[in-house]
Amino acid sequence: MESRAEGGSPAVFDWFFEAACPASLQEDPPILRQFPPDFRDQEAMQMVPKFCFPFDVEREPPSPAVQHFTFALTDLAGNRRFGFCRLRAGTQSCLCILSHLPWFEVFYKLLNTVGDLLAQDQVTEAEELLQNLFQQSLSGPQASVGLELGSGVTVSSGQGIPPPTRGNSKPLSCFVAPDSGRLPSIPENRNLTELVVAVTDENIVGLFAALLAERRVLLTASKLSTLTSCVHASCALLYPMRWEHVLIPTLPPHLLDYCCAPMPYLIGVHASLAERVREKALEDVVVLNVDANTLETTFNDVQALPPDVVSLLRLRLRKVALAPGEGVSRLFLKAQALLFGGYRDALVCSPGQPVTFSEEVFLAQKPGAPLQAFHRRAVHLQLFKQFIEARLEKLNKGEGFSDQFEQEITGCGASSGALRSYQLWADNLKKGGGALLHSVKAKTQPAVKNMYRSAKSGLKGVQSLLMYKDGDSVLQRGGSLRAPALPSRSDRLQQRLPITQHFGKNRPLRPSRRRQLEEGTSEPPGAGTPPLSPEDEGCPWAEEALDSSFLGSGEELDLLSEILDSLSMGAKSAGSLRPSQSLDCCHRGDLDSCFSLPNIPRWQPDDKKLPEPEPQPLSLPSLQNASSLDATSSSKDSRSQLIPSESDQEVTSPSQSSTASADPSIWGDPKPSPLTEPLILHLTPSHKAAEDSTAQENPTPWLSTAPTEPSPPESPQILAPTKPNFDIAWTSQPLDPSSDPSSLEDPRARPPKALLAERAHLQPREEPGALNSPATPTSNCQKSQPSSRPRVADLKKCFEG
C-alpha cells in the first residue's frame, strides 16, 4: 500500500525479460529474451538487468532453490516502478517483470507460470500468455484478472473470478489483484508474513521508530526473498504515510556508494556485500541484521515516541503476530492514528478559500508533553508533509476520503485538539492488568499472611486469658493449663485433685463437707470429707465458688487408673501435706454411700442432721484424756486412715501453722481448726535402726499424715506396731523441729484419715457397721494394737517383696 499507479500506462506490466548471470561484477548481465519485442527504453535496458543479480556473483555459491525478490526504481517525480524477479535454481538466469503495480503475489505467480512453460520449451504458449496480459487494460483498482490459454485475458470486477469458458481453452491460472482499500493480512501478504517471522517484536518497533524519524536504514540478510520482504513490509507499516526517500529493496554491487548518501534511505543489502558496505564511511546509519536479528542504532527513536504508543506496540504485537488476519497492520494503523490523528483540528476552512493546514494550531494542541515533543519534530518530516498535501489536494478538489486511517481516528478518538487515548489505556489495562494484579498480590500476600497470623495469635492469647478468668474450665490432674472438662471425667476425680497453684493460676476449690460435722449426728461410713488444709484457709483464692463442672454425673471411680496415675506423678517435695479423701470407701460395695450425688449438697444429709460437736477446751489434761481413751476407741475401729503418697502432696508452711494455732479466735469457730504442726510416720527396717537418729534430724518421709475431719477427743487413735520383731519401727515426728512445742497441746489436731493410694488394696475389709473414728496423733508412741497386726504384716510383705 506504499505505492500507487500514478500516470502509468493502462497495461498490467511494462516489460518482461530474462537475463543471464554475468561471470564477474564488472560485466553487465546479457538479456536472453524480452517482451514486447519492440521495447526500446535504452536506459532501462542498460540499468535494470543489473538489479537482477544483487549479490557477489564471484563469491556467492549457486542457490539450490528458486528465489523471489523485488527491486524498485524511483523517478524524479517520485513515481516508482517495481521489478519482480524469479532467480532460477543454480542462479543461471533470472526472469523479471517491470510494473508500476505493487502486486507481489500476482506477479510472483505469473513468473512461476512463465518459468514452468519456458522450462518445458513452451515458448509460444508463454509469449501468448504475456501478449494477452500486456494488451489488457485494467477497468478499476479492484479488478480480478483471469488468465486462460486459447481465450485471452478476461477481466472482471473484484467480486469474484468468472468460471473458465467452455471449449478447447485450458485454464492456466487465476490471479486476483490485491484490494488497495484493505490492509495487508497474514498469511496472504508474503512481505508481512516474512517480517513477523524473521524479526523480533522489539526490532520491529525499533525499525518502525527509525523510519518515522526518517533515518538512514540499512537491512542485511543472506536470503533475497526475506531481505526484500522485510523492506517492503516495513514501508507498509507506515501507512497512511509513504516513504518518500530512497528505496532500494536490493542494492546491486555497482550502487554500493548509495549507502554513504547523506539523505534518508531504506536499502537492502545482501549478506555477501555487507562487508564491502561496512568498509565505507557509514555515519548515523541504523543497521538491522535479519539473520542475527540485531538492530544497531545510535539514536533513541523508540524513547522519542509517546510512551503510550510504545506500550501499545510492545504489549500487543506478539499476540497479533501469531494470529492470521489484519492484526499487525491494524495495530500499527492505530499507532499512527494516535500520533497524527490530531491533524484534523489544524485544518483551516475559510469561505471562498481553499482548505489549508495550520502548523501553529497543530503544535498548539495540548495532548501531552511527550506527544507535543513528537509533533514538533513531525512537522519537519517529509512523509508528514506529503501526507498533508495529499489530504488537502483531495479536499480542495471536492473529493472526500474515508479510508482505513480516517476510520481509525474516529474509532480511537484521536482528534478534537487532544490525544484522547483512553481506549488505549483501557486496552492496556485489560491486557496488563492481570500481570499487575499478580505482581501486587505476590508482594502483598506474604505481608498479609504475617499480619493475619500475628492477629490470630494475639486473639488466641486474649481468648486464653479470658478463658482463665471467666471460662468454665477445669485444671486437669498433673497439669498447669486449663482445658474443658471431659464428659467421662468423674466429679469424684475432681474431688481428689490437690488444691495447688500453678504458674500464678488458681482453680476452683473442691466441695467441702464441713457443714455436716457442724450439724450433728454421724453419717454413713466413708461419707465424710476432710477439712481444708491450713494453707487453703489462709489463701485469698479459697473464697471462690465451686465450679459447676465439678458436679458431673455420678459415674463410678476408676480406682486402678487413679492408682497408676498417682504412681506416675514424680513430685519430689518432701514433707508436704494435703487433705485427701479416704480410699477406705472404695473397698465397700456401695459407692453411692461414699460419695455425695451431684444434685445433693455435701453438707446436707438425706434424712437427718448431725449434732454439732461441742468445742473442746484447750488444756493439757484434755489431751491426756484423749490419749487414755485411745485403746477403747481402737477396739471399736478396725483400721486407721492414711493419706496418699507424696506425689500429690503440697508443701505447708510451718509459720502459717503456728500462727493459726496461736490465734485464739479460731477455737471459737465451730469449723475444724487447722493442724498446728504436720506429722510424719516413718517405717524403718530393723537392720537400719542405727540410722534412725540421722533420719530424725533430716526426715525424708514417704508416708505423711494430714488432718481429716474433727472428732470428739474421747476417741483418739494412735498407729503403732504391736511387736518389735516385725523389723519395722513406726515413729512420728514433726516436719520442723524448731516449731512451737505448744502446738502439741492442740486438742483439735486429728490423725490421718486415708491410706496410701497405691497400697489401698492391701487393707483388710471390715464390716459395714464399723465406724471410722479419727485419731489424735502423738509423738513417739509405741503402743501395740492387736487389730493392726495383719495390716503391718501385709505392709512388711509388700516392702520385702
UniProtKB/Swiss-Prot annotation:
GO process terms (BP): endocytic recycling; endocytosis
GO molecular function: guanyl-nucleotide exchange factor activity; phosphatidylinositol phosphate binding
Location of the uDENN domain: 13-157
GO CC term, one of those recorded: nucleoplasm
Keyword Cytoplasm appears in the UniProt entry: yes
Residue stretches making up the dDENN domain: 320-398
Segments of skewed composition (Polar residues): 641-662, 693-703, 773-788
Segments carrying motif FXDXF motif: 401-405
Low complexity composition-biased segments: 619-635, 734-744
Start and end residues of each stretch annotated as Disordered: 479-540, 604-801
Compartment(s): Cytoplasm, Cytosol; Cytoplasmic vesicle, Clathrin-coated vesicle
Biased composition (Basic residues): 504-514
InterPro entries assigned to the protein according to its UniProt record, in alphabetical order: cDENN_dom, dDENN_dom, DENN_C, DENND1A/B/C, Tripartite_DENN, uDENN_dom
Gene3D superfamilies: 3.30.450.200, 3.40.50.11500, 6.10.140.1000
Signal peptide: none
Clathrin box (motif): residue ranges: 558-567
Keywords assigned: Cytoplasm, Cytoplasmic vesicle, Guanine-nucleotide releasing factor, Phosphoprotein
Sequence ranges of Basic and acidic residues compositional bias: 756-768, 791-801
Quaternary structure and interacting proteins, as annotated: Exhibits low nucleotide-independent RAB35-binding activity. Interacts with clathrin heavy chain/CLTC and with AP2A2, but not with AP2B1.
Protein name in UniProt: DENN domain-containing protein 1C
